[in-house]
């Protein structure tokens, strides 16, 4: 059994490697040929399974020898993006300082290479499957093609929003990234300009249309089912409902409100909103799929991200703070003093009656002088009852040394065994799409055309989180007063509901919001307490220099320049 060799798409340093009987790709292309696949039994299925199995778990960028703690797949980009705003605080500066403090973010840096390596590697995998499926795929190849089109759309959707200086609704001509599809030749790659927002989102929607066609049942003129729709066995591969969700996201981005609402509604079918018991589950909270999860990824016990570096190059190490400090002692968040916190102002805007507030340690606990009483208060958050573990996490966070704002939304897996052994505890699942997002998209999209109807939908959703919710008190503008109080209210719900799930910075860009890190009582790190009335330009990711060196048609975004020193304290939001 040999490995498929790596293919360099000029700008991609390391790409997808699959285990199969195929010896090599045609050098002039970015895909395997049909003859190669047909001569390797079962290889098509390997290509399809690799579309999702490579999303997390391996050191795709730097390799296992480097063990980078930001090199663990698609969920790493949640953190890398969202610490650029205000909703996530990174109190001790280390691995994620690049993105929180805007250090070394230019085109010649690893922060530029990282998304290029990952995303174009994933896109190459999609191109392979699309090419191998043929023009008119049948049977299992319909399922494979549908998944490939859906995922390619999702990847380009992320890239478009990360790299475009302006969102679609502001500037349709704003440049995104070069489009590489299943027909792009090596020669094409050398003169491949960045697609405009208009062209990119057209391409994304076309991919999603194809995905919908392949993943839903095929019927004849009489309505008889000729080919059944794709029936997945778990949430770790995209089906038609995920395509509906991706369309809802896309149409929200392009401002096509009716279509956004339509597809968000369709995506909700078959799923159930998380209730308090599920959202605040101390053992399975946000580490195990439930009836609200539409699409997700999971780390496996034999993943390099788990086996190498004590499991510390993984999502669990960054987000799961309940790891026994004496038995295991591992975890960047739990025991190395590098947790991610919720922004204090955002936390304080969450009413006490909203159950989502229970996922974050109350800042008032830091005012308790008696250690025994403090541990007792923290024990209310702990699955194990070990409040002293949470206290330890705060105490070892150099420069912060507090517990207020620590997150326990993303729980350690495996119960007591996982809390004692990170090789079990970090084997978690992470949602990429939840039905709650669809309810919020529907509410915003409906309300953009009929505000009263949108308010009704938003209120109905919010009252599933807080029975005492009253519309109209969460409408801070963050610099952009052109968005209505209703849109601001929708944004606040998204910030709270989807905290840590990779949406914060993308929403800031979509809504053209500023950021506010410096305010009375802030928990943001000194020297990085920046306020901006407009969307920071550092949120426009630079294209890696190797791409612009070899692709002469590709322009770049300006290298981000961080502010010097803290901003004046904000008195309003």
Give the residues covered by each predicted segment:
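TPR-repeat structural position
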Residues: 257, 451-452
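Sec-dependent bacterial lipoprotein signal peptides
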Residues: 1-20
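Conserved, well-structured interaction surfaces
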Residues: 90-163, 195-198, 212-216, 423-430, ...
